[in-house]
């Protein structure tokens, strides 16, 4: 998959230098405009494709809708794994998301509760599919460019959280607290309007700055497509560390957030809506902040933010210690565990490691490949990583229901 007009030499650089561009030794062949516009385009795609998810979190909308969205993401990843998704679908997927956002505004104003609930269930599945296809295409395109843009895509996903969080805080000060179907009417209207504007901008920038037309495929890419690549089994053996790391980080994050923290914390300790906004905001802000240092690892101060996949796997297993911490925050009534500052620190640490460990695999996997050197094979592995991310999210959000079988929520009895 080609990206820009000058990206036809991508795999020569990848094969021969294995990431020299990142250190600046190989020299960039992109123009000054491309050096700004391409990263911005991928950031915008990541931002807009995840805004709907973060809007649902910000509105504290029914948790089951989130599970249906993740199910849609997995469906899209399965499609991408067995079917070569045309690059031209990227702007159409983003356009579909924009239309679904408009549908939320109409449904909330005009439908009955049962109709709105049905629309949400269907729409969130389709949103998951559309967002998944957009992210799969963008990651596949970005990771095979002359300069790896996968990290910028990941950064855009992180920006979405803090972007929606800030808008949420501003709207809390401006709009009335009038609710319909237990959702703030004005906030839903404005948040989805902002989602639509971001998606329109993403469509414009992707069409103008990315080479999405298959008719303009370079000779080198045509030759690469005809050339026999490695089998799926060989590619899995070559990239299993990156795939496993991607699965683990997303599985744990979605198992604990938002199902245990903040949902079960709120049930146990009657946390106010404002404090819930702060806790959710901690995840969004620190997930955003942590996605940038790995992209700046060419600077000495940020050098330790990227490391080998072996170290990343070890850190992912250590990250399992968040499970008892989150459970205790729900199950224990001691002042330290009901303290909002401690809860925010807990959520911030989960979020920081989530964004950080999600970004590293896309930046380092190419250098650690032993057999896969062709562009076609690297595109396939990039798709594997996106599939691992979505399957991890899917397994995480559905296994969060396991905690319903344990008495971790403190029962509050009302005295008559």
From Swiss-Prot:
Cysteine disulfide links: none
Membrane topology recorded in Swiss-Prot or TrEMBL: Multi-pass membrane protein
Stored InterPro entries: Eqnu_transpt, MFS_trans_sf
Parts of the chain that traverse the membrane: 36-58, 65-83, 88-107, 120-139, 149-171, 188-210, 242-261, 274-292, 312-331, 344-366, 381-403
Residues on Cytoplasmic side: 1-35, 84-87, 140-148, 211-241, 293-311, 367-380
Keywords: Cell membrane, Membrane, Transmembrane, Transmembrane helix, Transport
Note from the entry: In contrast to the human transporter SLC29A1, has low sensitivity to the inhibitor nitrobenzylmercaptopurine riboside (NBMPR) and dipyridamole.
Similarity comment: Belongs to the SLC29A/ENT transporter (TC 2.A.57) family.
GO cellular component, one term: plasma membrane
Main function: Nucleoside and nucleobase transporter with a broad substrate specificity.
Gene Ontology MF: a single term: nucleoside transmembrane transporter activity
Location within or outside the cell: Cell membrane
Residue ranges, annotated region (Disordered): 1-28
Protein name: Nucleoside transporter 1
Source organism of the structure: Plasmodium vivax (strain Salvador I)
Reactions it catalyzes: inosine(in) = inosine(out); adenosine(in) = adenosine(out); hypoxanthine(out) = hypoxanthine(in); guanosine(in) = guanosine(out)
Effect on the protein of changing residue 23 to E: No significant growth defects in adenosine-dependent proliferation assay when transporter expressed in purine auxotrophic yeast strain
Extracellular side: 59-64, 108-119, 172-187, 262-273, 332-343, 404-416
Compositional bias per record (Basic and acidic residues), positions renumbered to this chain: 1-26
């Amino acid at each position: 998959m080609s990206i820009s007009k000058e990206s036809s030499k991508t795999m020569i650089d990848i094969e021969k230098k294995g990431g020299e561009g990142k250190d600046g030794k190989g020299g960039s062949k992109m123009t000054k405009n491309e050096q700004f516009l391409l990263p911005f385009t991928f950031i915008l795609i990541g931002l807009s494709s995840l805004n709907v998810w973060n809007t649902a979190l910000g509105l504290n909308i029914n948790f089951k809708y989130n599970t249906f969205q993740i199910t849609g993401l997995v469906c899209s990843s399965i499609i991408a794994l067995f079917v070569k998704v045309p690059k031209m679908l990227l702007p159409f997927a983003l356009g579909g998301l924009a239309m679904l956002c408009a549908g939320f505004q109409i449904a909330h104003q005009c439908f009955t509760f049962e109709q709105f609930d049905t629309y949400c269930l269907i729409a969130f599945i389709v949103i998951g599919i559309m967002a998944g296809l957009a992210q799969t295409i963008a990651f596949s395109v970005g990771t095979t460019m002359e300069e790896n843009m996968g990290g910028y895509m990941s950064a855009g996903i992180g920006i979405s959280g803090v972007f929606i969080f800030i808008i949420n805080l501003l709207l809390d000060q401006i709009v009335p607290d009038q609710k319909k179907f237990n959702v703030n009417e004005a906030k839903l209207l404005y948040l989805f309007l902002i989602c639509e504007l971001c998606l329109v901008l993403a469509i414009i920038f992707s069409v103008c700055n990315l080479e999405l037309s298959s008719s303009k495929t370079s000779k080198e890419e045509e030759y690469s497509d005809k050339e026999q690549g490695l089998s799926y089994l060989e590619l899995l053996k070559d990239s299993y560390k990156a795939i496993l790391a991607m699965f683990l980080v997303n599985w744990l994050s979605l198992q604990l957030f938002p199902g245990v923290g903040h949902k079960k914390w709120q049930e146990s300790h009657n946390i106010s809506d404002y404090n819930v906004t702060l806790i959710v905001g901690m995840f969004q802000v620190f997930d955003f902040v942590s996605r940038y240092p790995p992209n700046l690892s060419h600077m000495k101060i940020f050098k330790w933010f990227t490391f080998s996949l072996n170290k990343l796997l070890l850190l992912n297993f250590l990250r399992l210690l968040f499970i008892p911490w989150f459970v205790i925050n729900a199950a224990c009534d001691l002042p330290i565990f009901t303290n909002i500052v401690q809860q925010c620190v807990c959520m911030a640490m989960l979020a920081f490691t989530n964004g950080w460990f999600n970004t590293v695999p896309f930046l380092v996997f190419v250098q650690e490949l032993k057999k896969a050197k062709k562009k076609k094979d690297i595109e396939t592995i990039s798709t594997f990583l996106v599939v691992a991310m979505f399957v991890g999210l899917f397994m995480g959000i559905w296994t969060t229901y396991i905690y319903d079988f344990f008495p971790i929520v403190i029962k509050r009895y009302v005295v008559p």
